[in-house]
């Protein structure tokens, strides 16, 4: 209803101003601004729904002030371009309509009415309401009844008798199991669901709507609200350190806790969370690559579900035979948005919907088959009688190719339990949410029936039943939940440990690199993650007087305040204010101690603008003073005009990447010398090793041969045509995820470049 009202007010404002208000520059500008805000808000809501499937939530609010980088972002480039072009067209059309009767005399009353209607359209829009509620949630002091509902359980289970297998299905919400809506999509896992305790109304609440948040909610009974963006949790050294979570209770009760997934454990800090709460045995892509049958059989995120679940089965067998009490948690990935992935061993590789193949539905059908195969192995084993199997989605599906069909249904998360000791077949329609999962499992295992804000759905009353406005209530508790981190409120001294790549202050520890906004009563950490902008872009959003401490590689801040460190990959500390004074200190000891020193100086807005503009220079446009191209730092020497076909800097150098260009091209500002030596320090990747690699300057071509280890080769060139471009052509670029950012499409690697130097020869 509010959507229709806001649109009606918007339309009325446009028509009244266009036909009745007449000509006045001030009223035109004011009305266009407010109407433009309405358009921006609604496009933001549309775009947010496209990315998250959940409107404007915490993750979107974070992204609006940073950037959307990371997993699968290339799939969204075209929609993003479409939104920008559409926004430009709408603004142009809106301005043209409002000025249709600009030759008519100005009418104050109609101008005022049009502006008030425009303001009303903004106020009534769902986008404005969602953003307002999110902003309020950032500044509230909390809710006094939080302590009454947040309950810590006993730290042990009195007499544990059952092992636990807990399967998180990536985005595998219960909606997929509606056979009337999606016929024969999930027959294998659906049949198993119907044999157990099936909880049919599991809500998704704020702070539980992405993987690490869903894991925290299900194991600790609280949403993931933090003093930083949740997916940046990889930078912290401990995760809700004061909370008692399911893993802690299991460990205290004699369980050995295992976690197996196909993706990198560091992503979003899953390793930190699990290690902080009772898990001593973790297996991700790095740990599995030496034990899986085919280490090259991977998707954009890591190992396919069939590989991961095979390893989980082997671990289940091993642990069951040992007689040791254990829990085994596993997380699938093949159903990850936007398209999903199809394991090669499943029979269900294709699912048609609306008369055509649908990749997301196909991935769901394949993944559920793999999960069902794993469960059936456990059920057929002699150890099933001592086992509880839990299957749940980590969160509702985000925007994928099935999302518009899911939204036509009543959407709920998946949560069902299969008991080997006491078979129970029942569908329970009680209202509940993801935070109740851990408490329900704890209850089944013989522990308490509460865990944080979670309650057992077998013997307790969920917050979703107690509060009709549970989503608003959850946001009201956000400050209380953030306080559970026990995060410091001041920063006076700090210590950097170069060996561990950590910074410590006021009892807290963070992984480097790190940016901190420091005020009198608050220290706000801004870590760098797959989903966040680089720290220098985040710093560019600071106000002129905001105090900052920035710990990063020296070359990243050198272009601003320390040009002598432009080629240094050591750690440096910069602090100050963007509109005031800044200092840069080189971290030159293994254990380096520093102090914050913020001076209350006069703010120079010209200096501020210059700093912001420099911080926002993209990597490939950065230039430094050097007589060679150093590839382990961002940018290029001042003599280089532009370059292409080269991937991002890594600690050793950079790979060529045929996804960015079939050839490595380095164009210099001036012609290369008539005679010169080209000194190349590099290595080859895969099948490019020991093969001739063409290197061209103008019409002359030399051949470079590299091995898998870094070597230095000198090639002699004559350049009679005054060519200014160097071209290197890797013969067989290899598609691989090695060293890739998690979730990005594979790179096509050819040669790895450490340094290229042009040395003029006499004569």
UniProtKB/Swiss-Prot annotation:
Molecular function per GO: phosphatidylglycerol-membrane-oligosaccharide glycerophosphotransferase activity
Record bears the keyword Nucleus: no
Example GO biological process: glucan biosynthetic process
Compartment(s) where it occurs, according to its Swiss-Prot or TrEMBL record: Cell inner membrane
InterPro entries xrefs: Alkaline_phosphatase_core_sf (IPR017850), DUF7024 (IPR054288), OpgB (IPR020881), OpgB/LTA_synthase_biosynth (IPR050448), Sulfatase_N (IPR000917)
GO cellular component, one term: plasma membrane
Known pathway: Glycan metabolism; osmoregulated periplasmic glucan (OPG) biosynthesis
Membrane topology: Multi-pass membrane protein
Catalytic activity: a phosphatidylglycerol + a membrane-derived-oligosaccharide D-glucose = a 1,2-diacyl-sn-glycerol + a membrane-derived-oligosaccharide 6-(glycerophospho)-D-glucose
Transmembrane segments: 1-21, 26-46, 77-97, 108-128
A Pfam cross-reference name: DUF7024
Source organism, top-level taxon: Bacteria
Source taxonomy: Bacteria, Pseudomonadati, Pseudomonadota, Gammaproteobacteria, Enterobacterales
Function, in words: Transfers a phosphoglycerol residue from phosphatidylglycerol to the membrane-bound nascent glucan backbones.
Name of the encoding gene: mdoB
Main location: membrane
Protein name, entry field: Phosphoglycerol transferase I
SUPFAM superfamilies per record: Alkaline phosphatase-like (SSF53649)
Source organism per UniProt: Escherichia coli O127:H6 (strain E2348/69 / EPEC)
EC number: 2.7.8.20
Record-linked CDD domains: LTA_synthase
């Amino acid at each position: 209803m509010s959507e229709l009202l806001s649109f009606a007010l918007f339309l009325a404002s446009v028509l009244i101003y266009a036909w009745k208000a007449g000509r006045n520059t001030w009223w035109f500008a004011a009305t266009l601004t407010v109407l433009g805000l309405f358009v921006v808000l609604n496009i933001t809501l549309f775009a947010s729904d496209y990315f998250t499937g959940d409107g404007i939530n915490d993750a979107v609010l974070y992204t609006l002030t940073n950037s959307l980088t990371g997993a699968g972002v290339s799939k969204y480039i075209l929609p993003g371009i479409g939104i920008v072009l559409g926004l430009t067209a709408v603004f142009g059309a809106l301005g043209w309509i409002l000025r249709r009767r600009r030759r008519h005399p100005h009418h104050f009353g109609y101008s005022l009415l049009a502006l008030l209607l425009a303001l009303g359209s903004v106020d009534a829009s769902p986008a404005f309401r969602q953003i307002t509620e999110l902003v309020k949630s950032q500044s509230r002091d909390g809710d006094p009844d939080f302590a009454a509902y947040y309950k810590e359980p006993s730290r042990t289970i009195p007499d544990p008798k059952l092992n636990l297998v807990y399967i998180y299905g990536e985005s595998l919400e219960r909606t997929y199991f509606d056979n009337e809506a999606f016929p024969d999509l999930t027959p294998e896992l659906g049949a198993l669901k119907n044999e157990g305790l099936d909880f049919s109304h599991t809500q998704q609440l704020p702070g539980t709507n992405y993987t690490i948040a869903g894991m925290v909610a299900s194991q600790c009974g609280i949403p993931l609200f933090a003093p930083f963006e949740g997916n940046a949790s990889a930078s912290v050294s401990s995760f809700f350190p004061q909370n008692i979570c399911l893993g802690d209770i299991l460990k205290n009760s004699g369980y050995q806790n295992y976690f197996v997934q196909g993706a990198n454990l560091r992503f979003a800090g899953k390793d930190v969370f699990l290690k902080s709460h009772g898990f001593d045995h973790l297996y991700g892509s790095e740990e599995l690559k030496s034990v899986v049958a085919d280490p090259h059989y991977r998707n954009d995120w890591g190992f396919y579900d069939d590989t991961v679940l095979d390893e989980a089965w082997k671990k289940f067998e091993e642990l069951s035979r040992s007689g040791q009490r254990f829990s085994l948690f596993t997380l699938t990935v093949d159903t990850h948005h936007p398209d999903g992935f199809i394991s090669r061993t499943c029979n269900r590789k294709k699912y048609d919907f609306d008369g055509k193949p649908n990749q997301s539905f196909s991935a769901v059908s394949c993944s559920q088959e793999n999960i069902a195969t794993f469960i059936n192995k456990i059920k057929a084993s002699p150890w099933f009688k001592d086992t509880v199997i839990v299957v749940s989605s980590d969160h509702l599906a985000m925007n994928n190719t099935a999302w518009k069909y899911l939204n036509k249904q009543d959407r709920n998360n998946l949560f069902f339990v299969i008991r080997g000791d006491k078979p129970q077949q029942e569908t329970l329609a009680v209202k509940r949410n993801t935070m109740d999962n851990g408490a329900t499992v704890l209850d089944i295992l013989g522990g308490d029936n509460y865990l944080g804000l979670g309650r057992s759905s077998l013997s307790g009353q969920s917050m979703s039943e107690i509060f009709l406005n549970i989503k608003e209530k959850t946001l009201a508790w956000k400050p209380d939940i953030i306080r559970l981190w026990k995060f410091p409120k001041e920063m006076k001294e700090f210590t950097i440990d170069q060996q561990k790549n950590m910074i410590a202050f006021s009892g807290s520890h963070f992984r480097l690199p790190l940016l901190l906004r420091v005020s009198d009563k608050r220290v706000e950490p801004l870590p760098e993650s797959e989903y966040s902008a680089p720290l220098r872009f985040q710093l560019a959003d600071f106000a002129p007087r905001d105090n900052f401490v920035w710990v990063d590689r020296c070359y990243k801040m050198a272009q601003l305040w320390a040009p002598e460190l432009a080629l240094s990959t050591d750690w440096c500390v910069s602090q100050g204010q963007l509109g005031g004074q800044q200092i840069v200190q080189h971290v030159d000891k293994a254990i380096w101690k520093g102090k914050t020193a913020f001076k209350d100086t006069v703010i120079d807005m010209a200096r501020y603008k210059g700093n912001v503009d420099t911080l926002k220079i993209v990597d490939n446009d950065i230039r430094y003073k050097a007589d060679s191209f150093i590839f382990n730092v961002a940018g290029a020497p001042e003599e280089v005009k532009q370059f292409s076909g080269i991937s991002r800097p890594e600690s050793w150098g950079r790979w060529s990447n045929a996804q960015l260009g079939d050839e490595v091209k380095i164009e210099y500002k001036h012609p290369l010398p008539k005679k010169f030596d080209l000194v190349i320090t590099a290595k080859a990747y895969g099948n490019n090793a020991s093969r001739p690699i063409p290197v061209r300057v103008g019409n002359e071509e030399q051949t470079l041969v590299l091995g898998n280890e870094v070597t230095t080769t000198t090639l002699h060139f004559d350049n009679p045509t005054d060519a200014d471009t160097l071209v290197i052509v890797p013969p067989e670029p290899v598609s691989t995820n090695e060293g890739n950012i998690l979730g990005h499409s594979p790179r096509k690697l050819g040669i790895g470049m450490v340094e290229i130097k042009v040395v003029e020869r006499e004569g």
